[in-house]
């Protein structure tokens, strides 16, 4: 089953450096949208400058990272896991945020790191994790894509609260 979590990035440079290490990715499981690995910090800052100018603000650069982990029993190839990560990023971010998707294959636990800019460059708005982009919605989109690829699922019944704690989410993934 696919487990997903999201967190704020403290240092974009460090997150990117960690994510794109050759021994973790074999150098070819990397996709970007509206940015490049080599200039990601500058690319994200350019969107931030446009946001600050349009909104008369002086915000600092902020970004987030989604970690999407796959169950080894789903027998995904690294390429398929990467394609799923890119599809997820496209659907969740709706073409409005710059992103980097990197698939790590150095362990039995294939997983994606999806680093994205908090700036919606299309509308000059900030990523809103409290309304449209809630953790619940993140998991629902992940679930839809997992179903599309016949990946095993975590039980999220309709009677569940809108929010379940990450520990409970992981416990359900393990079936405990």
Model region roles, listed by residue range:
Residues 1-176:
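N-terminal nicking endonuclease/strand-transfer module with a His-rich metal-binding environment
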């Amino acid at each position: 089953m696919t487990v997903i979590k999201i967190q704020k990035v403290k240092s974009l440079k460090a997150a990117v450096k960690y994510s794109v290490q050759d021994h973790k990715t074999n150098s070819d499981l990397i996709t970007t949208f509206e940015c490049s690995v080599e200039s990601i910090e500058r690319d994200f800052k350019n969107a931030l400058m446009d946001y600050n100018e349009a909104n008369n603000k002086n915000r600092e650069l902020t970004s987030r990272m989604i970690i999407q982990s796959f169950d080894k029993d789903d027998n995904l190839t690294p390429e398929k896991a990467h394609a799923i990560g890119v599809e997820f990023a496209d659907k969740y971010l709706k073409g409005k945020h710059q992103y980097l998707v990197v698939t790590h294959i150095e362990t039995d636990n294939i997983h994606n790191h999806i680093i994205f800019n908090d700036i919606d460059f299309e509308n000059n708005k900030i990523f809103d994790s409290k309304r449209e982009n809630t953790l619940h919605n993140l998991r629902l989109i992940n679930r839809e894509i997992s179903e599309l690829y016949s990946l095993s699922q975590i039980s999220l019944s309709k009677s569940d609260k809108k929010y379940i704690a990450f520990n409970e989410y992981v416990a359900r993934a393990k079936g405990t």
